[in-house]
Amino acid sequence: MTELAQKLPADVDARRQHAVELRRWLHRHPELSFNEAETAARVVAELERLGIPCSYPGPGGGVIGRLETDPAMPTIALRAELDALPGADLTDPGYRSIYADRMHACGHDAHMTMVLGAAALLAEKPPDGNVVFIFQPAEERGGGSRVMIDAGALEGVRAIFAGHVTQEWPTGKIMIRKGGMTAQSDRFCITVKGKGGHGARPHEAIDAVVIAALLITTLQTLVSRQTNPVHPSVITVGRIVAGTAANIIAESAELEGSIRTTIPETRDHIHKGIRRMTEAMGELHDAEIHLELSEGYPPVINTPEEVGLVRTCVRELFGPDALTTAPHASMGSEDFSYYLQHVPGAFFRFGARRPEWEPMPLHSPRFDIDEAVLAIGAEFFDALARRALHHYASATP
């Protein structure tokens, strides 16, 4: 057990086993974005067991639980995600996914367990205020936070908080930073239309594969040579589809990728650059090139007041050594950003790595957590909710 876990009150020990069992059940039963019916049913059952009224509209929606003590008092929200990811699960066989093609590779099973653990503590000793528990669908692939916003999850909410497990830090550390926590994420699809031909007669064809390869390398110069390096940005081509046989010059090729930026000016610059380069490449090689740019999640920008609440709560609950920060925003993306377009809030990270583990990245088929973090997260969300509600009530004239 970590030093931080040992600092938790004794009554948390009685909940720890239930938390581990719940998290392992969720881990064994992963469901993909907008198809989380079984997961949602388990969350509803847990909330009902605690006597917390909740609603769930069915597949495609999320679960909203409301612990209301006084309508005149402030309301805050705690958020977790229901969905998992496609891919094989190579974690502990004792709780490995029962499905061959999907797993909780991003820790959403842990997030649900933490927020439900906090719900149990808050229900047992109601706070001076109201708490909304948001269990959203489709964080990974569909911007499910917007579904929850449309469903009224933020009505009357003063601020919202969410955490995310990571092996970047050891268990016992909680990381938060002012301002940007994550990057803006956009996607692109480039279709190259050339002219097919025989591999022996390239002069009679327009090789879509060669043009695609040139595009891949040229696009990287947008970051390395045309963007201010003090503002991080990443262009990734993650998928290429082209060709039918080794001796046939491909008539078409398709590239799909992502763009990650940290400020709007860099984003606009890269979007314009991709348009310019695709148009020029088509003209240069006498090919038709079609570009489709799709807007992704905005950056998560933590608000100063809520960052202060998180930092104070970490220090008071676990001591100053538990608090850490990061020198720059993560280049990952998070649809928690949509909530922050409506209300203030803060997004932070829970270290979840055992001392003997080598860090494993999120979305890896081997990503797992030190289950000691479950009690830490539940206790922290409980304390944060109480501190935030007290703070907002005190600030109300």
What is the role of each PLM region?
Residues R66, C189-K193, S258-R260, E292:
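Residue-level recognition of well-ordered beta-strand positions that form the cores
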Residues T2-H104, D109, T113-D128:
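Acidic/His- and Gly-rich active-site-bordering loop/insert found
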Residues A77-R79, F188, F347-R353:
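Non-cysteine beta-strand/loop elements that form the S-adenosyl-L-methionine
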Residues E31, E81-D83, A138, T166, ...:
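Active-site beta-loop-alpha junctions enriched in small/polar residues
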Residues S55, V132-I134, H290:
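A structural signal for isolated positions on well-ordered beta-strands in alpha/beta enzyme cores
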Residues E3, A213-P397:
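Metal-dependent amide/peptide-bond hydrolase catalytic core
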Residues V63-I64, A84-M103, D109-A110, L121-A250, ...:
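Histidine/acidic-residue-rich, glycine-tolerant segments that coordinate divalent metal ions
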Residues T2, Q6-P9, D13-V20, S33, ...:
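Electropositive phosphate-/nucleotide-binding environments in soluble metabolic enzymes
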